[in-house]
A protein has these predicted regions:
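C-terminal catalytic/substrate-binding lobe primarily of soluble NAD(P)-dependent oxidoreductases
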Residues: 1-137
Length: 138
């Protein structure tokens, strides 16, 4: 209907925009939730994950600077593949130290980092995996 490619089921698609209108998009989401009690987007299951991929060769001991930084970018991948490979989510790729050197373009895994996992973001990730991943946290 909209001229976008979908998966084989026809239910899922992704749209790329080379810009982000947060000032407009955020207001629409807030007003929709407040006035209509409706979300502008609500996942029904854990289908996909955005994982950290190296922008350049990184050395052991380097600290990742997260989204918008100089060390990693986010790559969308199926949740099952992300969980089974223990890929590092892009949202958790800030202020973590590499325990091994990683070549440009490689997905960073949990085995590649040393991170303080007591922060709330890490705890929320663990709860999400326990709730939405068959068999719980991987």
């Amino acid at each position: 209907q909209y001229g976008m490619d979908t998966d084989d089921s026809g239910r899922y698609s992704a749209m790329f925009k080379p810009f982000h209108l947060i000032g407009l998009e955020l207001n629409i989401s807030i007003l929709s939730a407040a006035l209509r009690q409706q979300p502008t987007g609500a996942p029904v299951c854990f289908n996909a994950d955005v994982v950290a991929v190296t922008k350049r060769d990184l050395n052991e001991g380097e600290t990742l600077d997260g989204e918008g930084g100089y060390t990693v970018w986010g790559k969308l991948m199926p949740a099952a593949a992300s969980v089974s490979s223990q890929a590092l989510p892009i949202g958790l790729a800030s202020n973590v130290t590499l325990t091994t050197a990683i070549k440009q373009g490689q997905i960073i895994t949990m085995k590649d980092i040393n991170a303080e996992t007591s922060a709330q973001a890490w705890q929320v990730r663990d709860k999400m995996l326990a709730q939405f991943t068959p068999g719980g946290k991987s």
